[in-house]
From Swiss-Prot:
The gene is nuf2-a. This is Kinetochore protein Nuf2-A. Residues 143-277, 308-461 form a coiled coil. GO terms for cellular component: Ndc80 complex; nucleus. PANTHER family: KINETOCHORE PROTEIN NUF2, MEMBRALIN/KINETOCHORE PROTEIN NUF2. One of its GO terms (biological process) is mitotic spindle organization. The lineage of its organism: Eukaryota, Metazoa, Chordata, Craniata, Vertebrata. It is found in: Nucleus; Chromosome, Centromere, Kinetochore.
Length: 462
């Protein structure tokens, strides 16, 4: 009791909560503080627990009064009166651990106490508050899930449309497949040639870069050696200054010579630095050359496409010129044949007039037959749509009935298991009760025999 995970509510707050959220009608009006504290009424507590269990487990009132009919019970009239209380005990033993109340006892329902009732009801109220907040979050998740499903459907539809467009764009028409294969083979050959040239140039540049790096390392090594020599010479100069006393002229000539050597060393150092900068620029240029080559490759590909377009245009122009020459020749031959055909046309026109009359009659008959066939097809299509709708409706009803059947089977199976558990518990309790009754009857019979024997002894004494 000291390690609760929920507060103990006052009796007045509990009464207000159950009036507003659990009880209805006259039950809410007649429910007051004295029903649960300090001396709870068992019938009111049982009714309150029943209403709470109805709301939590979605049970009907008739389910609390149901007695399993598939069990062989010795005294069914006793079970009928005890069925609601047994169902309440079973469900409360299952429900209260969810509310963090682990010390439930059947006496809390059969003979409730004030403090234990407040403890249990406070845990139930805390659980109901928590379930209400979680229910709101669950509904929000459901709404977001529905919107996400709708977005997924839209995206799938857009994806399918995009795939259809991609397939249309990627497929090559049959009349252009030969040309496409030829162009792809030419492009592949050009890419191989370009890649081979690029590899050769790349190898040459890499060799030059490696050579420049080795030269640069040698120059740096020489420069470091010269720096070390200058430092040693300066140290030697300082050491010799302290040991040798020279004339001013000799000292001046030596200092001039040393200045000249220092100047030469500085010039050599400057030259090496310039060469280092030059080689560094060459290395950077070699690194940048790769991006330029890639750009040149792209430009070459663009030039190849432009050349291909130019070749196609030239072929079309040549083909059109050939067609023009052929058409001129045909025009000359046709001009000769024109005179002959004019005479033939006059004869043919007369025949065509007769044939046109016959064709008009046939066309009218054909249009009439076509219209009749279209009307019959439209009627058949309407009937087909009606039948299809009926079939879809019947299939939907079948699916619904199958789902309801499965749900009903699951609920009946669960109810059957629960009833069997209650009956086994109740049978064990009845067997214990029968044993106790039998023992009590045996004890009373023994006492009766003892009293009769004592009375007989007293009567015999008299």
């Amino acid at each position: 009791m000291d390690k609760l995970t929920f507060p103990i509510f006052p009796a007045a707050d509990l009464v207000n909560f159950f009036r507003q959220n659990i009880l209805t009608g006259t039950e809410a009006k007649n429910f007051n503080k004295n029903d649960i504290f300090p001396n709870p009424k068992p019938e009111m507590v049982q009714k309150l627990y029943m209403r709470i269990l109805q709301q939590v487990f979605n049970y009907g009132v008739e389910q609390f009064y149901m007695v399993p009919m598939d069990l062989d019970i010795q005294y069914p009239h006793l079970v009928e009166g005890f069925a609601p209380v047994a169902n309440i005990l079973k469900l409360m033993a299952r429900f209260l651990p969810m509310c963090r109340v682990y010390d439930f006892h059947p006496s809390d329902v059969l003979n409730p106490k004030g403090k234990r009732t407040l403890h249990s009801l406070s845990g139930i109220v805390n659980f109901l508050h928590f379930s209400a907040t979680r229910k709101e979050v669950y509904f929000e998740y459901c709404s977001s899930y529905k919107s996400a499903l709708e977005n997924v459907r839209q995206l799938q539809k857009a994806n399918q449309e995009a795939e259809i467009k991609i397939e249309k764009l990627t497929t090559v028409p049959p009349e252009q497949q030969a040309e496409f294969k030829a162009l792809s083979s030419e492009i592949h050959d050009l890419q191989q040639i370009i890649s081979q040239e690029y590899r050769a140039k790349d190898v040459a540049f890499q060799e030059k870069i490696a050579q420049r790096k080795t030269e640069f390392a040698e120059k740096n090594k020489r420069l470091n050696e010269q720096k070390l020599a200058i430092a040693t010479m300066k140290e030697e100069q300082e050491r010799m200054k302290s040991q040798i006393v020279e004339s001013p002229e000799q000292r001046k000539s030596k200092t001039e010579r040393m200045k000249e050597t220092v100047h030469r060393l500085k010039q050599a150092r400057q030259e090496t630095n310039d060469k280092c900068d030059y080689y560094r620029d060459r290395v950077a240029f070699a690194c940048m050359w790769q991006t330029d080559v890639q750009g040149y490759l792209k430009k070459l590909q663009g030039i190849d496409t432009n050349l291909e377009i130019h070749r196609k245009i030239r072929e079309e122009i040549r083909h059109s010129e050939e067609q023009v020459v052929n058409l001129n020749l045909e025009l000359k031959s046709l001009s000769n044949e024109d005179a002959q055909l004019k005479r033939i046309i006059l004869v043919k026109k007369e025949k065509l007039a007769k044939v046109d009359i016959k064709n008009k009659k046939k066309q009218e008959d054909f249009n009439q037959q076509k219209q009749e066939i279209l009307e019959v097809c439209s009627r058949i299509q309407e009937k087909r749509q009606v039948v299809h709708g009926r079939v879809a409706q019947v299939l939907q009803e079948i699916q619904q009935t199958i789902g309801k059947k499965e749900q009903l089977l699951e609920t009946t199976e669960a109810g059957k298991k629960k009833c069997q558990e209650v009956i086994t518990d109740f049978r064990a309790a009845l067997e214990k009760y029968h044993d106790s009754l039998q023992k009590a009857s045996e004890r009373s019979a023994d006492r009766r025999r003892e009293k009769i024997a004592e009375l007989n002894r007293r009567l015999s004494r008299r």
